[in-house]
């Protein structure tokens, strides 16, 4: 029996991980966020109500589940409290079942101002960040100057350290970026009231998880972003500032690899990307319009239109290897309904040398042309279908081809936005390792 399951994105984020986490967590005891911050955007549709979570684990919509924001996550206490209050409007109360690692770095106003100032300075070369301070917060962590959640428990020490960090940031903001300074006193004034609201949630979450594992509890590890936004394995420098691949689970929670039983890779039936960076299968035609309209392809965090393209199996296969995936979940299959033909990119070709490239260096991407296989589409609606056998033959053929190319099984298929629009090909809790 698989007790501990990792759910991560195989593309550039926005794969639909939140819904999958929500569906699987109903049978679990814990759900854990292990990297990223409130730059993530997990959209859930429950009883026709849309709920968007940026920081709190998606599985907390189930009232029997305990949520963990682990040490690999950078936390804005203001955004956290905002989400807690938003959930309360849906009669979901998490105060007594959400725990935050005392080691999680804080995101504060100076991180946001630095993020904005840098993007402005870069101009047309900007990376397209969310402007929420994620990168600068991770920089502080690596430079060993970060304020962490645990620091909120000592107001005197917090005040002293905060003033030093603000002085450090203001020197750069004013002198180099010609940006407005931040006010240490205002940051402290705004921060202090948040402490009482989250004080009891601050814990040694690694110990909580170790105890849960020893007690044979089921744990879902919820990834944010996608594999090709990973700081090490993504399309650098157009990446996020954390490890969104499998390594982020281990370092971001303190749970060792032997305790991970099954790794589920979530991929859309096509491809999308928000912001700048390489995207070999990108479309600019009527199919792009079809994906955007039918798939509602606008970022849940930024509101930006997502770039769309055909499924990139070259990238997907690389993600399978990097993450040691056990199986796949294909989402938004219903968005392909009504297309005359469907394509899968199976290789990259350098347009100058005609050489087949496995995975390009950053300077090579601009010379890459996708090589496609083409398959017939289908007219029958797949929206809401719950059994594999009920899918159109062409849709099943498409799924089979993805399995052949990636050499791992497709265990889950999402056929619509609601939590009930899903096909469980296999029960991943009971697949033998």
Swiss-Prot record:
The annotated active site, in chain numbering, is 14 (proton acceptor), 42 (proton donor)
What Pfam families has UniProt attached to this entry?
Adenylsucc_synt
List UniProt keywords, sorted A-Z: Cytoplasm, GTP-binding, Ligase, Magnesium, Metal-binding, Nucleotide-binding, Purine biosynthesis
Instruction: Please give the pathway this protein is involved in.
Output: Purine metabolism; AMP biosynthesis via de novo pathway; AMP from IMP: step 1/2
Read off the CDD domains from this record: AdSS
User: Which residues bind Mg(2+) per the record?
Assistant: 14, 41
Q: Which cofactor does it need?
A: Mg(2+)
User: Mind telling me which Gene3D superfamilies this protein's record contains?
Assistant: Adenylosuccinate Synthetase, subunit A, domain 1 (3.40.440.10), Adenylosuccinate Synthetase, subunit A, domain 2 (1.10.300.10), Adenylosuccinate Synthetase, subunit A, domain 3 (3.90.170.10)
Molecular-function annotations in GO? adenylosuccinate synthase activity; GTP binding; magnesium ion binding
| Recorded superkingdom | Bacteria
Give binding positions for substrate.
300-306
Gene Ontology BP annotations: 'de novo' AMP biosynthetic process; IMP metabolic process
PROSITE patterns given in the database record: ADENYLOSUCCIN_SYN_1, ADENYLOSUCCIN_SYN_2
Give the principal location in a single coarse category.
cytoplasm
Where on this chain does IMP bind?
14-17, 39-42, 130, 144, 225, 240, 304
Kindly list the positions annotated as binding GTP: 13-19, 41-43, 306, 332-334, 414-416
Give the UniProt entry's GO cellular component terms.
cytoplasm
Catalytic activity of the protein: IMP + L-aspartate + GTP = N(6)-(1,2-dicarboxyethyl)-AMP + GDP + phosphate + 2 H(+)
Q: Which family does it belong to?
A: Belongs to the adenylosuccinate synthetase family.
Q: What does this protein do?
A: Plays an important role in the de novo pathway of purine nucleotide biosynthesis. Catalyzes the first committed step in the biosynthesis of AMP from IMP.
Q: How does it assemble?
A: Homodimer.
In Swiss-Prot or TrEMBL terms, this protein is called: Adenylosuccinate synthetase
